[in-house]
């Protein structure tokens, strides 16, 4: 089954303003001029590092919790680019208000359509979605609605559009990215990597 194109949204992140005598769209970011200059480093999730889901019962519990959550879902995937051929996901991270953060090892399952079903109709938030959507699709995961924070940052004209840079510029938080190019096929995954992964959503 070919995935349908998600509805891509940038609402809430950017808005257009036009002058009566000027038909050019000017894109601005809410609160951009009032950024906090002091950056606060984030080194651990406020609700701790979750256990990695590796069992069917854990996956079912995760799906039920995500379905019971509210609002959009932050989604990310970690690969082993540079270490293995292909773009397979070796860890999937999801966070949704009311359900918490979930780290899923896709290796024992191969198919995560139960998670996709739990998020049916929910807007997904990804950064640089074009990098993660192919590997998520291989797992049976595809959003109905999508908000790409990298695309929003580009539309807003931010000088740097990497996830850590966007978070620093707009929220005043420092996000460590030292494990982004790690070999995520490694098992077991080291605890610092899991902490990094949980902070990524």
Cite the ranges covered by each PLM segment:
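N-terminal accessory regions of nucleic-acid-interacting proteins
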Residues: 1-15, 19-73, 77
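Conserved DEDDh/DEDDy metal-dependent 3′-5′ exonuclease domain
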Residues: 47-75, 79-201
